[in-house]
Amino acid sequence: MIIGMLRAHMITSLSPIPTMPSVNINKPKARFLYAI
């Protein structure tokens, strides 16, 4: 669970600027799934 969150964080930090908005929109969903 924690590893998944770290991977998601790394992906968001490494992703190009154009794709950032879409990733940020998906962030809450990922956090919700990891929380479960």
UniProtKB/Swiss-Prot annotation:
Induction: Expressed at low levels in exponential phase in rich medium (at protein level). Encoded antisense to waaL; it is entirely within the waaL coding region. It comes from the Bacteria. This is Protein YibY. The gene is yibY. Pfam families: YibY.
